[in-house]
Amino acid sequence: MAERRKYKKRYCKYCEAKVDFMDYKDVGALRFSLSERYKIMPRRLTGNCKRHQDMIATVIKRARAAALVPYTVTRNTVVTAPFENLR
């Protein structure tokens, strides 16, 4: 049986900063939780706690509905710095 991959323990940066509310219009803060294809990154990679991961998912979904962040990017249009044009 294959062994499970071990990940380094990460700590929630939102808990350390004592964040209680996140705004969907703050696209710059969302970039740490999105991949280069604008997918929501999992908790094991970002180190977020469950509470903040759920909050981030809700905020990203609201930003997508408001057309501030694209839903997905096709393979041909992936860019190396996806948030350069969102500033």
From Swiss-Prot:
Keyword tags: Ribonucleoprotein, Ribosomal protein, RNA-binding, rRNA-binding
Transmembrane segments: none
A Gene Ontology term for the protein's cellular component: cytosolic small ribosomal subunit
Origin superkingdom: Bacteria
Function: Binds as a heterodimer with protein bS6 to the central domain of the 16S rRNA, where it helps stabilize the platform of the 30S subunit.
Subunit composition and interactions: Part of the 30S ribosomal subunit. Forms a tight heterodimer with protein bS6.
Annotated protein name in UniProt: Small ribosomal subunit protein bS18
Keyword check for Ribosomal protein: yes
Gene3D superfamilies xref list: Ribosomal protein S18 (4.10.640.10)
Gene that this polypeptide is encoded by: rpsR
A Gene Ontology molecular function term of the record: small ribosomal subunit rRNA binding
Source organism phylogeny: Bacteria, Pseudomonadati, Campylobacterota, Epsilonproteobacteria, Campylobacterales
GO BP of this protein: translation
InterPro entries in the record: Ribosomal_bS18, Ribosomal_bS18_sf
Family assignment from sequence similarity: Belongs to the bacterial ribosomal protein bS18 family.
NCBIfam families membership: S18
